Amino acid sequence: MKLTVLSKEEIEKIHHTTLKVLNEIGVAVRNKHALELLKRHGFKLDGRGDVVRFPKEEIEKTINAFSNDIDIYDREGNLALKLGRNKVYFGPGGGAPNLLDLQGNRRPSTKEDVAKVAKICDALPNMDFVMSDITAQDQPLKVQDLHELEAMILNTSKPLVPVCLGNGHFADTVYRIHQAVHPGDAGVGKPFIILYFQPSSPLQLDKEPLSRLLKAVEFNIPLIISGAMTAGGTAPVTIAGALVTGNAEVLAAMTIARLVNEKARIIYGVGGVAMDLYTGNFCYGSPELGFLSGVAVGEIAEYYDFATWGRGACSDAKVLDAQFGSEVFMNAIIPALGGVNLIHDAGRIDFGKSGCLEALVLADEIIDACRRVIRGFKVDEEHLAFEAIKEIGVGGTFLSSRHTLKNYKEELWAPKLFTRLDFTAWINSDKKDIEQRAHDRVEKILKEHRPKEVDRDLQEEIHRIVMEGERAVLSAS
């Protein structure tokens, strides 16, 4: 099934307005190496020092350079994610400073908590890639990202998208870890780590993220380039205007990436949120998220033929209540029906300021239901079921028919966490609510699940690379 909200004419209006912004207003490029690269290729500055005009012809070269056909592997070297049209995958987010822990306390998160997130996601069937969800607040600020990466690698074999706080040193570390895990793969032919670049709205590409971008595309590491504009704050309050702002930032950054490596594996995103103008909070649970990070972004990316990154299955709720369930389903189904390839932030709560292990488990269940909706249903001879109707006839039951036995598992979604007991049966059972059942599932995974193990020598090598990366970052600061 597919959801659309924009006509081709509307997408073209967004595109042409984006071209006007890039050519007439420009984007600040606050990295001397990126500026020198642009100057060598004939780009003009507008007289303010670092604001670059991006002409239409160069943007068209960028659009034509990159493909939506990107393969991502797991740590073991197996194909895990095949990006392209209507390929939809989910994963958690990253960067939350707090954890709503298993005792119900909201506290600063730790490296050990990140390891638990990775282990939980490794066990959850609908978490297709892994981010840290939270941050290693017990590590030095400038190298928290390195420690989060180490914790994830050792606790899941799924593809990783680490949140990076630093500069090109992080890309160096990622490349070295890839070489340690897959010796001889100098060209990163089977990438299991995707790096992340985020502009600063409105219309700014900052020094450290650009250093990371330049290194990533040089090493041929897949790179997400995603805006993070806030409608009503760092971008126009109108959805179309916010999309134009984010699109301009992302196409400018993609153009810089192209000048380094025309065959770079770039994943396009806008990733915007709406601001609540009454509280000043950035809303992860708003219906507008479905446009700013979901279906509209998917349609624009399809117009360009780019692989896509978006946001969804997240909530502004503080606990696992009715608001959480409502917002997570709303913001999972919209980007998924829009064909966004990689949908992150699953299970995020509290405006993205907190993580919660039980929330990941509950989001996984909701995503599973969403996938049933996305899959739709078949209309063919077998599924029209004329012969079954004829066999059962008037007034019969299909409960025990061969047709039901053959097709029910494919047709009817069965929950793993939600209950379908009637009230009497529920009263006579353990009477646990959804939060308690999610808690039990977390406890069971942490106790029983065994991710594919990294052998001891490789663990030590990864730790050595991380510590060398830490020293490089701290000595440069």
Feature roles, as predicted:
Residues 9-13, 26-40, 46-48, 82, ...:
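N-terminal glycine-rich anion-binding loops that anchor highly charged ligand groups
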Residues 36-105:
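Glycine-rich, N-terminal phosphate-binding loop and its surrounding beta-alpha-beta segment
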Residues 39-46, 230, 274-278, 308-312, ...:
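Short acidic (Asp/Glu) and glycine-rich catalytic loops that position anionic groups and cofactors
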Residues 108-337, 341:
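Helix-rich catalytic cores of soluble enzyme domains
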